[in-house]
């Protein structure tokens, strides 16, 4: 079931059948951002998640040597090697649904797995994009904010479980597993290697010159 933003839903109540006597209980739950009932557009191409003109080496990606992207949540993620404080921009427009920018520590320590600064943007079709390992206090957007493709989200860093300054970028989709639990699985990513609107303008200018 999808819970709308800024909403809550009571899932159940726990009470003792023997008044005055002690009791114990445990709970188990799972959740994921997005909508598992909707299918993302598999033909969509994303812009690179950093400012135009910036050059980056791919440190890790699907199809190459994999060192840490072994789970379904990161199988198709791409690690872009970037100097700290490099501008990070939205690869696709959407709504910011998650922001963390208060973590300061980073390094190749598994204890830091959940201590990376992150921005998550939700899109139509139920998918999200994740921008991870951002700089401390390096996020310039807030939850609920609508962003456009290419808009500044923050600055790259080296927070959390990280072997060096880079941007971990992933497109994810909420998926319901056979056991009923919900997970955030990564999806294959296609990038376009040019600015479509800019390319069209250049193409039109070239046609005018030829005439």
Language model features: what each stretch is:
Residues 2-10, 200:
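Solvent-exposed, conformationally flexible loop/turn segments
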Residues 46, 57, 109, 139-148, ...:
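Acidic, glycine-rich catalytic/binding loops that coordinate metals and/or anionic ligands
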Residues 11-116:
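Surface-exposed, glycine-biased beta-strand/turn segments
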Residues 119, 147-160:
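Short hydrophobic beta/alpha edge segments that flank linear recognition/processing sites
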Residues 5, 52, 92-93, 143, ...:
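Short, flexible surface segments
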Residues 83, 89, 125-150:
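Short histidine-centered loop motifs in beta-beta connectors
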Residues 57-59, 79, 88-90, 98, ...:
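Structural recognition of the beta-strand scaffold that forms the well-ordered cores
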Residues 103-111, 156-168:
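Active-site loop architecture of trypsin-fold serine endopeptidases
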């Amino acid at each position: 079931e999808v819970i709308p933003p800024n909403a809550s839903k009571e899932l159940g109540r726990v009470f003792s059948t023997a008044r005055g006597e002690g009791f114990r209980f445990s709970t188990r739950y799972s959740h994921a951002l997005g909508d598992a009932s909707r299918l993302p557009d598999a033909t969509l191409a994303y812009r690179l998640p950093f400012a135009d003109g910036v050059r980056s080496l791919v440190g890790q990606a699907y199809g190459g040597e994999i060192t840490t992207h072994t789970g379904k949540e990161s199988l198709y993620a791409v690690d872009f090697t970037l100097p700290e404080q490099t501008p990070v921009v939205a690869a696709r427009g959407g709504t910011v649904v998650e922001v963390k920018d208060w973590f300061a520590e980073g390094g190749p320590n598994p204890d830091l797995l959940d201590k990376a600064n992150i921005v998550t943007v939700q899109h139509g079709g139920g998918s999200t994009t994740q921008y991870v390992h951002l700089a401390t206090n390096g996020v310039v957007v807030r939850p609920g904010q609508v962003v456009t493709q290419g808009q500044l989200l923050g600055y790259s860093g080296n927070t959390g479980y990280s072997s060096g300054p880079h941007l971990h970028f992933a497109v994810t989709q909420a998926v319901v597993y056979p056991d009923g639990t919900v997970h955030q699985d990564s999806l294959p990513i296609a990038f376009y290697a040019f600015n479509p609107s800019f390319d069209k303008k250049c193409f039109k200018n070239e046609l005018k010159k030829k005439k």
